[in-house]
Amino acid sequence: MNKKFCCIAWLLLAFVGSLHAQYRTTTYCNPLNLDYTYPFHNSHLGKSYRSGADPAVVEFRGEYYMFVTRSWGYWHSKDLMNWDFITPEKWYFEGCNAPAAHNYKDSVLYVCGNPSGAMSILYTDNPKRGDWKAVPSVLTDLQDPAFFIDDDDRAYMYWGSSNRWPIRGKELDIKDKFLPMAKKPDSLLYLRPDIHGWERFGENHTSDIKPFIEGPWMTKHNGMYYLQYAAPGTQFNVYGDGVYVGKSPLGPFEYAAHNPFCYKPGGFATGAGHGSTVRGPGGIYWHFGTIHLSINFKFERRLCMFPTFFDKDGVMYSDTYFGDYPHYSPDQVTRQTVDGGFRGWMLLSYAKPVKASSQLESHPVTNVTDENLKTFWVAEKNDDKQWVEIDLEQVSDVYALQLNFFDYEETEFWGRVPDLRQCYLVEASVDGVHWQVLADYRNSFRDAPHNYIELDRPAEARYIRYRHHYVPGKNLAMGDIRVFGLGRGKKPTAVKGFTVARDTDERNARISWQPVKGTQGYNVLWGVAPDKLYSSWMVYGDNSLDLRSLTVGQKYYFAVEAFNENGISQRVFLKEAR
């Protein structure tokens, strides 16, 4: 009897353990896979679309809370990876807008973000319940607020979202309803696009329209105050976050030589601005930001996160290198180094042959392998007869998948929509005849519009097949089906003919190199010192880059590397470009 009992117990443990292994993940991939809200402040457009932007992420009593523009609530996590949505007892009817959040000594959590711009500071000691109360005062003319209480219990508010006005700040009286302590605020940060190339407006910084400064956030580190801000516009690939550094909360502040400190202009998911910086597991900082999608509407957006560091000289930088490929998750503390947490899994599906059960001519199935967040495939019908098959062209080791769903001509989804889910089966094959299941979501009840799936063990495959079962709404529309792993061929050889020509307008540089055979793309890296190449731009389908994000009078150092599905070439360095 005892032997039988022990055997059954062992089998149960083995079964539970296998389930745990199957769903445990040690990596993540941008865009973040959240159950984004359908905002309705633009319902007059007649389009339903998901969006998430301007994340304010704070730690509170060892857990994390994320407040996001127009979301009708907020998210909670124990590990910065797995987020569950909280519908609070009390909240803004229209959803908060560009919110601020601050943890005051683990006693109360403060938040503000009234869309009207006139607001009380809200507080609670139970954010899971969401019984928010209002401080009995109203602060006016606050766009994109940021709230900060220093170690000495002095409180400050920062704000700004304008192409006319600067980021401003003022001290509040923590003992008297957080009323302002001075009649006039301090003007703290102005954009200088004539000097700082990255602050110029437009896609790739090519517009002469006056840029926007917005989204402040304050981080105190080693006694210094890092006042962060976003520019030049949320609807562009070059939306990023810069930083000024000072010795006191209201400055004076000095422009950091390495700027923008968080910047993701190339690749699949572009944009990384209007964010927040939070200390996560193991004391490692994470910067959350905003990705631009801007198809249904210019403010259609997604969220991203990057490990963020302060180097030995106090330079703040986010690791956006391969920033939309799998990276180690925040709980993998020992693998988060100053060189970043890129997992090393390459993109196997880029530009590979693909076929489908059906397609609209205007949205062909080739869009699911083009590595462009703005394009998507639409099937003729939304039924369980639809499928997609990708030929990786060689047998490879598949480690992870990302499936991106899209809202196409939807008109009936508003706010927090119940029972949203995506149901499907993903299979793999070596020969296109015999198939094995990689991921079975046919009975899923989870809303996962950017579902990232890390396999419990690598799968040998040449063909990947998506078999559709159900999505809500009128249409089946999918962006990229991204397959990550390692090919079994050769890495690219090192780049040759690498040149950087700084323009007479020092904000610009023309970077070029000779094409490398068998390459998917290239990473161009640059920085203000040979050991500070903290910025990078992923380039597909070209062997040149017009870089327009440099600072007048600042020396820069550059490097380039090639990559494909098999790995990354040796990096080629250029000592200096004046």
Predicted features along the sequence, with ranges:
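Extracellular low-complexity, O-glycosylation-prone stalks/linkers
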Residues: 515-541, 559
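Predominantly extracellular/luminal regions of secreted and cell-surface proteins
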Residues: 168-180, 335-371
